[in-house]
Amino acid sequence: MSTLLIDLQGQELSQEEVELLSHPLVAGLILFTRNFHDRAQMQALIQSIRQRVKKPLLITVDQEGGRVQRFREGFTQLPAMQAFACLIDDPVQQTNMAQQAGWQMAAEMTALGIDLSFAPVLDLGHQCQAIGDRSFHSQAEMTLNLASAFIDGMHQVGMAATGKHFPGHGHVIADSHLETPYDERPKQQIFAQDIQPFQQLIQQNMLNAIMPAHVIYSQCDPQPASGSAYWLKQVLRQQLGFNGAIFSDDLGMKGAGFMGNFVQRCEQSLQAGCDLLLLCNEREGVIQVLDNLKLSETEPHFALRQQRLQQLFKRKTIRWSELEATSRWLENRKILTALQQRWLDNKANKH
């Protein structure tokens, strides 16, 4: 059963990485800035992966826009998601620009050979260190409208959408990359506010995948959401009726340390309801998991998990030369880059 997404150490594929990626437990990989030199090199790396690993691999990246954009040189400088509502007054224009940003991101990643960018962020508010201007808005309705438009743009290109970080990472100050944050708000407040964008998009059948937060919601469950059967099985699957794939957030992050060693983190996440597990920047941890994680094809959700994985591969193929020749790409590149520059100038002036 393929369940693990791992990372690469450099800009070329090593023989060790070919062997790791070929392991039956490995479903795919996530790319980072360290893997990127320029567009030609990245296309060659992806081609090498496809040729040398003799099975389909889900190739992913975080290309959200703003400060979380792994590939910059040669790509559209996508605006931070907060910029749409903050810098554009007309609601129709706000959603139009969000849709164009979703399309532009997905088109560029698809032309590069990537299946999936983990987007959009559905967290509310801008106070959290880890989220900040990655979120569209502090209000659920505005977040829903802008995220829906962004996803529509992604879907036009044939890229699956991943809502994150369920049930909402926006109301904690701590960064889950560095520690395990606690959200101590009452359950009613989380359900009335933070969960709304997720719930509405699930009802509209717009989310193909969801990534939970490494956050402990202490009034609801003692486990972080990424390892909580309450959040993933009871709330997400049963109450909200979500049938798509559930990714763990990176199990190499400090916020996941609450769940034990790397094998225990994977086991708990799977038992809680995750289908696919990210384990990044921990090569020894990856090897430990591949050597020790035991999964059976007789496991009740085996076939369903594999089916959910298959739904995440890109639906269309487009050449970069074809993309560059389209008027939509050219116009978007100009407008979105200008919007991001306005956003950066706006932030600089506030400081």
UniProtKB/Swiss-Prot annotation:
State which pathway it belongs to. Cell wall biogenesis; peptidoglycan recycling
Give any Gene Ontology cellular component.
cytoplasm
One Pfam family matching this protein: Glyco_hydro_3
Sites where the protein binds substrate: D62, R70, R134, K164, H165
State its Enzyme Commission number(s).
3.2.1.52
Against SUPFAM superfamilies, the record matches this protein to: (Trans)glycosidases (SSF51445)
Subcellular localization, as worded in the UniProt entry: Cytoplasm
| Claim: Nucleus is one of the keywords in the record | no
GO:BP terms for this protein?
A: carbohydrate metabolic process; cell division; cell wall organization; peptidoglycan biosynthetic process; peptidoglycan turnover; regulation of cell shape
Protein's job: Plays a role in peptidoglycan recycling by cleaving the terminal beta-1,4-linked N-acetylglucosamine (GlcNAc) from peptide-linked peptidoglycan fragments, giving rise to free GlcNAc, anhydro-N-acetylmuramic acid and anhydro-N-acetylmuramic acid-linked peptides.
Name the protein family. Belongs to the glycosyl hydrolase 3 family. NagZ subfamily.
**Name used for this protein in its record:** Beta-hexosaminidase
Taxonomy of the source species: Bacteria, Pseudomonadati, Pseudomonadota, Gammaproteobacteria, Pasteurellales
